Design a protein with these regions (language model features):
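Residues on the lipid-exposed face of transmembrane beta-strands in outer-membrane beta-barrel proteins
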Residues: 2-4, 55-60, 68, 144-150, ...
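Membrane-embedded beta-barrel scaffold of Gram-negative outer-membrane proteins
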Residues: 3-5, 10-16, 20-28, 215, ...
Length: 467
């Protein structure tokens, strides 16, 4: 993060470079077979690189103020790398999986033909029955933006903003194994059981923003905003074989989904006092091509451009100092999220609630500032409420995330200007309640019935030092 004062304006250059690596070996039971089938799953050295560059030029305060900038984001998966492996523990279990998961006889399949990349030194060889491999997967987003503020007087400010963006991506990936015996790769010359997908795409658009801000007095501000935003589209993993007979998935799944467009209108109030502050915002969002996360009966999740939708509601945050040591804060939102059109392939009618949207959530915090062994310290207790959401437009409680409430506790000490010690307890009362329920009959040969609980009480001790 580099800042420089050029005199007439300020410049800020922000560069971020991250590498993320994920390795794991998991003992699991495939959901399309009996629970007792041993079928290890390997995430083998998944590595991705993310690079962000942003340059902002910012004017000095005055009657007319401006900010212009450049933003670039790049994502790359490790090229020519194995992403995932599933294998049986011996030949007998491999033949069991072949028969019941893919309808294959022992002589129909030979895992040794997929070398490379799955050779003798690979864990699970030669009892491999599914794997994925990335030749390349690249994404890039570039945008230029500007915001221009005109201070009409000490109370009134008018704002105009613009953002021009372009998104490009390209990928080539392979899947191998018993589920793809009718495929022979991109060029048709690979061994049977090689599924290849080569994808690329790009899109660009320009979005605008308009705003007005009026300071009634030092303690009260009113504002209104109208802006067009977007959530980036991209490519997604192919449907797994057990979704091949799912009618809903086959009707609307696509390896590529586009960016959506959100036309947002907001009206807000900011109030301040000697011992309090409050912000209240009403928002209304008209979506076009909204990205909906779909969970069909086969249990897979994917993104789908669901046409037009509308979300509207309120956001509130409030702080109140009871005295010099004790303060309260509240933040919450309540909204409705509905499709504006019929989506026959998903069984949705205009006015139905959008899947996987939490319409109500809030947090209430109590803070006590004190000293412990002469160190400035604080204790904080939070009550968190998470509203329910449903996987489908049908709002089936057997495919949903029920609402729940939990308590969190934090105790922090400022050991010096640079070092801090913090004790955190998540789910203080060790509440045991459902976080996710999935119990539906699907198009595979057996129903899927399982449940996730919210994480149990978790205690974390963290020491941080700032240089």
């Amino acid at each position: 993060n580099i800042k420089y004062d050029f005199g007439a304006f300020d410049a800020n250059l922000i560069i971020s470079d991250r590498t993320v690596t994920d390795d794991s070996v998991t003992d699991w039971a495939r959901i399309d077979m009996d629970d007792y089938v041993p079928a290890p799953l390997i995430v083998d050295g998944d590595k991705s690189y993310q690079e962000t560059t942003e340059l902002r030029l910012i004017s000095k305060p005055g009657k007319f103020e401006w900010t212009v900038g450049y933003y670039n984001y790049k994502f790359n998966e490790e090229p020519n790398s194995v992403s995932q492996t599933q294998y049986a523990v011996d030949q007998d279990w491999l033949e069991y999986v072949m028969l019941y998961a893919a309808g294959l006889n022992p002589g129909d399949y030979d895992a040794t033909v997929y070398c490379p990349p799955f050779c003798e030194d690979h864990l699970g060889y030669p009892y491999f029955y599914y794997g994925s491999y990335t030749e390349y997967n690249e994404q890039e987003e570039t945008s230029f933006y500007g915001q221009f503020d005109y201070n009409v007087n000490d109370k009134l400010t008018l704002t105009f903003g613009i953002r021009d963006y372009e998104i490009e991506d390209a990928s080539k990936s392979y899947q191998y194994g018993i589920f793809f015996m009718d495929s022979n790769g991109c060029d048709g010359n690979d061994p049977a059981g090689t599924d290849c997908a080569e994808l690329s795409g790009s899109e660009s658009d320009t979005r605008m923003k308009y705003a007005i801000n009026y300071m009634v007095n030092d303690d009260l501000t009113l504002y209104a905003t109208q802006a067009a935003g977007y959530r980036p589209g991209g490519n997604q993993a192919p449907l797994p074989p057990f979704c091949s007979s799912d009618e809903a998935a086959q009707a609307n799944f696509s390896r590529r989904f586009n960016s959506d467009e959100a036309e947002t209108t907001e009206f807000g109030v900011k109030a301040r006092g000697e011992n309090y502050s409050a912000n209240v915002t009403y928002f209304d969002v008209d979506w076009d091509g909204i990205i909906i996360q779909v969970t069909p009966g086969c249990g897979w999740r994917y993104n789908f451009n669901g046409g037009k939708a509308e979300t509207s509601g309120w956001e509130v945050d409030f702080t109140y100092a009871v005295n010099d040591e004790i303060s309260l804060d509240f933040a919450g939102s309540s909204m409705t999220a509905e499709t504006s059109i019929d989506i026959s392939s998903l069984g949705a009618s205009a006015g139905d609630r959008l899947p996987n949207t939490v319409e109500t959530q809030w947090n209430l915090g109590l803070v006590y500032d004190t000293t412990i062994m002469s160190y400035p310290s604080y204790a904080r207790l939070d009550v968190n409420y998470y509203g329910d959401s449903f996987n489908t437009f049908a709002e089936n409680p057997n495919s949903s995330s029920p609402d729940y409430t939990k308590l969190n506790f934090n105790l922090g000490l400022d050991l010096s200007e640079y070092s801090k010690l913090q004790l955190s307890v998540d789910n203080l009362t060790d509440e045991r309640t459902e976080a996710y329920v999935y119990a539906v009959d699907d198009t595979s040969w057996r129903p899927r019935n399982w449940m996730q609980w919210i994480p149990p009480r978790t205690v974390t001790l963290k020491y941080s030092y700032s240089f």
